[in-house]
From Swiss-Prot:
The keyword Endoplasmic reticulum does not apply. GO terms for molecular function: argininosuccinate lyase activity. Its EC number is 4.3.2.1. It is found in: Cytoplasm. This is Argininosuccinate lyase. SUPFAM superfamilies: L-aspartase-like (SSF48557). It comes from Salmonella dublin (strain CT_02021853). Keywords: Amino-acid biosynthesis, Arginine biosynthesis, Cytoplasm, Lyase. The gene is argH.
């Protein structure tokens, strides 16, 4: 039976019912709805709506229902209830009879669903934080094992300067640390309870909403009933967190797809995260990474869609807000899955050090070192930049790396160049000189790994 049928003289058209009902997706809020109902039953005792014995009966029945849901959540989908609130109330009435009809006193589905969703979001954020830190840990461990793997760093997808595979891993640790910080920040704003705000104007019963918030594990209660039932900022924030986080994972995936390609050949992915071709027997495709990259778009779409849904809504609750859940559930599920999959990709990855080093020695990645050498000899940097550009053109003409050019050829471009230039052009020198904080020198990379291990308690 619908929770609102008394006002109507005709039954809803079945097509409208299917269009209107939300149980097919909000069934995921079952546990939160039951937990919120237990807390609400306690609040009703404090204002004399329920006796202590009635509340005990309701709580016992709700706890039984909670266990049933945990064992078999799919049972909910066999019902024709309108939404999860209707389903829980119907099941409660089945268990305790007329007493179950007293539970909704002073409560609206508006504050009820807002509470359910915040509880679900809090739990999901904790799962995301755990997965995020697991991926950070996997990256740190991979960095630890590959501090000596020199490879080219890129700008514009052109070889630029030598870096290490460890330094590359640590770049993504930094991105994930920012994602972690955003989630922690979002969690603070999630931690206020809307329960007790009614449909929009507050509840008619003098319930202690701060006490009620505490029973549900919230830090405090919201301050304005109109805002409380219409607020979906937390949905937007989480979708934004997910969108940014998925951009980071997509870039991670794109880098590794390139590193794994025959053109680069820097890494080989485990058989456990790759697949083959139905036609070409030789293929080993990076499907896990391509799916991470591909799934980024649907998360961006969920954020954009939710913004468009909310932008024109007047206060307070509108049925449009029912559209908040499917996109949110899918986006956070997707982000969580991709965090786990990215960690799995790193488990078993093989870094091909000789190929990485060979690539780092090509493409004149040490050209900046020659410019810095000239600066140390008193040549202004802009002039040094031009000189080295000319030297690179000559090296290309001769088909040699810079360090293979004879001294006489180098001195054609600047008389200050001496024999001491050659050690400066080695890969190791290129790395060693980047010794400022955040640089790629072995000492800085080792320190960054130690710092990350300490922060992650590894």
């Amino acid at each position: 039976m619908a929770l609102w049928g008394g006002r109507f003289t005709q039954a809803a058209d079945q097509r409208f019912k299917q269009f209107n009902d939300s149980l097919r997706f909000d069934y995921r809020l079952a546990e939160q709805d039951i937990v919120g109902s237990v807390a609400w039953s306690k609040a009703l005792v404090t204002v004399g709506v329920l006796t202590a014995d009635e509340q005990r009966q309701l709580e016992e029945a709700l706890n039984v229902l909670l266990e049933e849901v945990r064992v078999n959540p799919q049972q909910i989908l066999q019902s024709d209830a309108e939404d999860i609130h209707s389903w829980v109330e119907g099941k409660l009435i089945d268990k305790v009879g007329q007493l179950g009809k007293k539970l909704h006193t002073g409560r609206s589905r508006n504050d009820q669903v807002a509470t359910d969703l915040k509880l679900w979001c809090k739990e999901t954020v904790r799962e995301l934080l755990t997965a995020n830190r697991q991926l950070q840990s996997a990256l740190v461990e991979t960095a630890q094992a590959n501090q000596d793997a020199v490879m080219p760093g890129y700008t514009h997808l052109q070889r630029a300067q030598p870096v290490t595979f460890a330094h590359w891993c640590l770049a993504y640790v930094e991105m994930l640390a920012r994602d972690e910080s955003r989630l922690q920040d979002t969690l603070k704003r999630l931690d206020v309870s809307p329960l007790g705000c009614g449909a929009l104007a507050g509840t008619a019963y003098e319930i202690d909403r701060e006490q009620l918030a505490g029973w549900l594990g919230f830090a405090s209660a919201t301050r304005n009933s109109l805002d409380s039932v219409s607020d979906r900022d937390h949905v937007l924030e989480l979708l934004s967190d997910a969108a940014i986080g998925m951009v980071h994972l997509s870039r991670f995936a794109e880098d590794l797809i390139f590193f794994n390609s025959g053109e680069a050949g820097f890494v080989e992915l485990s058989d456990r995260v790759t697949s083959g071709s139905s036609l070409m027997p030789q293929k080993k495709n990076p499907d896990a990474l391509e799916l991470i990259r591909g799934k980024c778009g649907r998360v961006q779409g969920a954020l954009t869609g939710m913004m468009m849904t909310l932008k024109g809504l007047p206060l307070a609750y509108n049925k449009d807000m029912q559209e908040d859940k499917e996109g949110l559930f899918d986006a956070l599920d997707t982000w969580l899955d991709c965090l786990h999959m990215a960690a799995l990709v790193l488990d078993g990855i093989q870094v091909k050090r000789p190929r990485c080093q060979d690539a780092a020695q090509q493409g004149y990645a040490n050209a900046t070192e020659l410019a810095d050498y000239l600066v140390a000899k008193g040549v202004p940097f802009r002039e040094a930049h031009h000189i080295v550009g000319e030297a690179v053109v000559e090296a290309i003409r001769q088909g040699k790396p810079l360090e293979a050019l004879p001294l006489a050829d180098l001195q054609k471009f600047s008389h200050v160049i001496g024999d001491d230039v050659y050690p400066m052009l080695s890969l190791q020198s290129c790395l060693d000189k980047r010794a400022a904080k955040g640089g790629v020198s072995p000492q800085q990379v080792a320190q960054a790994i130690d710092d990350a291990r300490a922060r992650l308690a590894l």
